[in-house]
């Protein structure tokens, strides 16, 4: 149950009954401090101002018709017109019992939509680097959350598998085969292979001519070029899948929807834009002029959809892509997890898409932009030599550091268990350090912070789960064999339950806003509430069996909520660390 939404509806009804215009926002939020109740309605002052009435007097009118029977024990008018809402203890206990009995922990299923999520999108013939990390893990966390709510999610890994660079790659592949009769296509060699191809293209005119010829042949469907191109794609995706599997990211080869997939649509789209009068010839190119964007002279900005040589641009592909996702995939929402520097490019493509009628306004096109990963010097994260950090190297280092950490904390563990724990902690640390930051901000990558057992980190959250689970292991009790009802006898129990019952609010916020840090913050606060409860309320040595069973139920619901929340982030838990 989403208690915030329930109370918001009740306050909205009361607002209208008290004379507010229909649809006036109740603006119910979680209270910042316990003395202000569990929830606070903040919308009354704004409505009173529009009505020209005293906010506190209007708040009293709302309170007179507000029906929170069985939900709130007390509602107070505070300040200039806030409503502080204190939840009823019986209501809280009943909802906690219901959540524990439910495999979904009380989270209601949403009205199912078809949602396309575009994320990760590495380039072919190049290794994944740290710049791909944010799109990959943020997108995957949101996808997992949407699926948990019951949506049909189509993962779209929009890989860079097309373009003029493939001419030089195929030409170099042919050169190596002619010289050696064999070519190793291990991806560790492919990064070097790409650099070598580029050098030849830049410095050897004969090679460059051949490469440009292969571009034309590949675009024309030449069988040999297509075979070489497919080999490059296959080799790249095998290596990428290793990274996905290590990171516990749910993408597979079946989710690849590369740029090449839309090639057959591009010429028809340009023709249609011309027919609609949207695309016009300008200096030999086909250009769409957008009044919504101005150039430096204040004139409508021109967006090229076809170059004078007949070639198409990324914008053309993105127009086709959005059209395909609506017409062929039936998308209700399309989420693009692409870095913030691409924002104007996407907005221009979507403006054209809307003007052309390819995607109706009822379908939501959303750019979930993200900031950069920075080094401690505040500059983009690089190797010591100033080069790009390979993602695989970053994950290797995380495992080495986590192994040292586990060795220092628990040296008596068996080697195989040590390795399992270290690998799980390593991947969790890399992911959580990113996911716990607001998506749109840059963040500093810091090994010491991300592997710390204090603060809002993966090791802390994994240990929080292990600590709760150990209560049951110590007592030899199963979380699923508890009896009796939850009873609130202490203030710390009530505070823990109130936080536990905010789980659905966190889940729905992540799904709506594409912001996984909301879940991280929620889980961190929950772990803190459990610590306070654990210190104040004895569990296994409680004064009687009824209280013991009730507190064990709260511990079980805490463990299950942390485990489920971390799972939605793509992070695994451990029974012991």
UniProtKB/Swiss-Prot annotation:
A motif ('HIGH' region) lies at residues 122-132. Gene3D superfamilies: Arginyl tRNA synthetase N-terminal domain (3.30.1360.70), HUPs (3.40.50.620), Isoleucyl-tRNA Synthetase, Domain 1 (1.10.730.10). GO terms for molecular function: arginine-tRNA ligase activity; ATP binding. It catalyses: tRNA(Arg) + L-arginine + ATP = L-arginyl-tRNA(Arg) + AMP + diphosphate. SUPFAM superfamilies: Anticodon-binding domain of a subclass of class I aminoacyl-tRNA synthetases, Arginyl-tRNA synthetase (ArgRS), N-terminal 'additional' domain, Nucleotidylyl transferase. PROSITE patterns: AA_TRNA_LIGASE_I (PS00178). Keywords: Aminoacyl-tRNA synthetase, ATP-binding, Cytoplasm, Ligase, Nucleotide-binding, Protein biosynthesis. The keyword Protein biosynthesis applies. Its EC number is 6.1.1.19. It is found in: Cytoplasm. One of its GO terms (biological process) is arginyl-tRNA aminoacylation. GO terms for cellular component: cytoplasm. It comes from the Bacteria. Pfam families: Arg_tRNA_synt_N, DALR_1, tRNA-synt_1d. It is an enzyme of class 6 (ligase). Monomer. Belongs to the class-I aminoacyl-tRNA synthetase family. PANTHER family: ARGININE--TRNA LIGASE, CYTOPLASMIC (PTHR11956:SF5), ARGINYL-TRNA SYNTHETASE (PTHR11956). This is Arginine--tRNA ligase. It comes from Vibrio atlanticus (strain LGP32). The lineage of its organism: Bacteria, Pseudomonadati, Pseudomonadota, Gammaproteobacteria, Vibrionales. The gene is argS.
